[in-house]
Amino acid sequence: MNIKTFEFYLFDIEGTTTPIEFVHKILFPYSVEKFDSFFQSNLLEKEWIEKLILEGKNDTTYSGKLSDSAFDLSEYCKHLVSLDRKSGILKEIQGRIWKSGYENGELKSSMFSDVPSFLKKIQASKKKSAVYSSGSIQAQKLIFEYSDFGNLTHFFYAYFDTGVGGKRESSSYSKISEQLGVAPEKILFFTDIKEEADAAKEAKLHSAILERPGNYPQPQHSHFKISSFEGLNP
């Protein structure tokens, strides 16, 4: 796969740079464990609480009680995690909880071993890297700052979350292209999900799908398929 023609390399996190197992067996359970104490400590601003309550009241999948009590808010967040819901409010709360966990040493993020060397290659070739994940920008930065390969944040030019839109919507990738100031054809997006790659392609980006250990099998597709960043020369 020749990737030298691209100027920007856009990375998903879960299943691409970081094992799915780390996200689902370490990060998610950690946040669930800490929801109670987080809300009991009154660490969330009133406007966020109101947004969370409103989301819950409009959520047809939830039948529990909703109020501004720590218990109710915690229970609803646990419900969202159980559904793997890409809720912006949930991601904000999780990001704050994870920040505390990383800073006090309870968390350290896991990275595929080929990631640091590939990021170095991109930087050495005068190209640029960016991140697009459903996790909040704060959570993205934490994963790369507290990785088991040290702080990798200096390799990234920009971070994008669902503030630009959902990852299965082509308009999100168009916005990213515009904000980066580079033609979409000059961006290569790495992901592990076919529907995300399809959306990027619709916006005229190129995509490569990672087939990592632990990743979910994808429907048949025509995107580039790779199992590692090893051997790729930007």
Curated annotation (Swiss-Prot):
Organism per entry: Leptospira interrogans serogroup Icterohaemorrhagiae serovar Lai (strain 56601)
HAMAP family, sorted: Salvage_MtnC
Region annotation Disordered: where it falls in the sequence: 212-234
Quaternary structure, from the entry: Monomer.
Record field: catalytic activity: 5-methylsulfanyl-2,3-dioxopentyl phosphate + H2O = 1,2-dihydroxy-5-(methylsulfanyl)pent-1-en-3-one + phosphate
Domain of life: Bacteria
GO molecular function: 2,3-diketo-5-methylthiopentyl-1-phosphate enolase activity; 2-hydroxy-3-keto-5-methylthiopentenyl-1-phosphate phosphatase activity; acireductone synthase activity; magnesium ion binding
Record text on cofactor binding: Binds 1 Mg(2+) ion per subunit.
Family to which the UniProt record says this protein belongs: Belongs to the HAD-like hydrolase superfamily. MasA/MtnC family.
EC number(s) on file: 3.1.3.77
Protein name per the record: Enolase-phosphatase E1
Annotated metabolic or biological route of this protein: Amino-acid biosynthesis; L-methionine biosynthesis via salvage pathway; L-methionine from S-methyl-5-thio-alpha-D-ribose 1-phosphate: step 3/6; Amino-acid biosynthesis; L-methionine biosynthesis via salvage pathway; L-methionine from S-methyl-5-thio-alpha-D-ribose 1-phosphate: step 4/6
InterPro entries named in the record: Enolase-ppase_E1, HAD-like_sf, HAD_sf
Cofactor: Mg(2+)
Job description of the protein: Bifunctional enzyme that catalyzes the enolization of 2,3-diketo-5-methylthiopentyl-1-phosphate (DK-MTP-1-P) into the intermediate 2-hydroxy-3-keto-5-methylthiopentenyl-1-phosphate (HK-MTPenyl-1-P), which is then dephosphorylated to form the acireductone 1,2-dihydroxy-3-keto-5-methylthiopentene (DHK-MTPene).
Keywords: Amino-acid biosynthesis, Hydrolase, Magnesium, Metal-binding, Methionine biosynthesis
